[in-house]
């Protein structure tokens, strides 16, 4: 609609019960002037309402070295509304440039989880929390690129979530080997430090991070189709609740992004939630 940005790297979507939509974008930091990460609001008829206010610490300089804000292709992958629709959450996929380095085989890193609160009919930024990410799991080759990042959130309540972490490493060359690691956690904000007043958390050792408990390691699921062999799990980065089964069990649906690549596929996997 009028006023909407002409280009986006859209990733997450959250829809209210009335059909109102919010769409997160990683932005386009690889071009100058840079398009910043965003969460954009649309009506039920997909009319453009406008962007939510993003705290400056997530924003990159308009040109020059990326010394501040989200790194390239590591912005707002995730997006979720709480069940009462009073809070909206997204997160940087990995550490902000001023917060620290990304994950490697020998070190983890810390992403920032960002809360918006509904006030007067609009969502405004409120708190931020340190979200810990593990080191990239070992692979049997020397990668040219590696990452472990937070790619999806699914709210269970005001402070409880399912979160999806995706690790990835790739070898140089068009036919280089790849490895993907998908893990889903039950996540709690209870007791975590609000870091919204801190432009940088680099070197801070007294922060209490978001608490995480592993509930699904996709690489360890033996019932996956043969094409989804452990060493080449696809690019899973979406998650929502699926249909309720006949016995009353809830389900979880996860989806992969094929990146328009002939080497990848779009998969939908449905899991029964066992309490």
Identify the function of each model-found stretch.
Residues 1-275:
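Sequence/structural signature of beta-propeller domains
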């Amino acid at each position: 609609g009028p006023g909407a940005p002409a280009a986006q790297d859209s990733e997450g979507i959250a829809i209210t019960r009335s059909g109102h939509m919010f769409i997160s974008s990683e932005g386009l930091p690889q071009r100058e002037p840079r398009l910043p990460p965003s969460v954009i609001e649309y009506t039920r008829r997909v009319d453009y309402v406008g962007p939510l206010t993003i705290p400056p610490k997530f924003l990159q300089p308009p040109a020059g070295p990326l010394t501040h804000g989200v790194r390239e292709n590591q912005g707002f992958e995730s997006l979720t509304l709480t069940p009462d629709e009073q809070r909206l959450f997204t997160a940087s996929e990995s550490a902000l440039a001023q917060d620290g380095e990304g994950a490697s085989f020998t070190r983890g890193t810390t992403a920032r989880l960002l809360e918006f609160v509904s006030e007067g009919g609009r969502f405004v930024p409120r708190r931020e929390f340190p979200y810990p990410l593990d080191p990239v799991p070992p692979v049997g080759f020397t990668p040219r690129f590696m990452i472990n990042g937070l790619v999806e959130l699914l709210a269970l309540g005001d402070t409880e979530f399912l979160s999806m972490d995706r690790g990835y490493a790739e070898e140089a060359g068009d036919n280089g080997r790849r490895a993907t690691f998908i893990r889903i956690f039950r996540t709690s904000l209870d007791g975590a430090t609000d870091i919204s007043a801190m432009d940088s958390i680099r070197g801070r050792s007294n922060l209490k991070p978001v608490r995480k408990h592993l509930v699904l390691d996709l690489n360890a699921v033996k019932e996956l189709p043969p094409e989804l062999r452990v060493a080449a799990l696809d690019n899973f980065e979406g998650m929502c609740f699926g249909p309720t089964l006949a016995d009353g069990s809830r389900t979880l649906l996860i989806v992969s992004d094929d990146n328009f690549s002939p080497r990848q596929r779009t998969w939908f996997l449905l899991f029964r939630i066992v309490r």
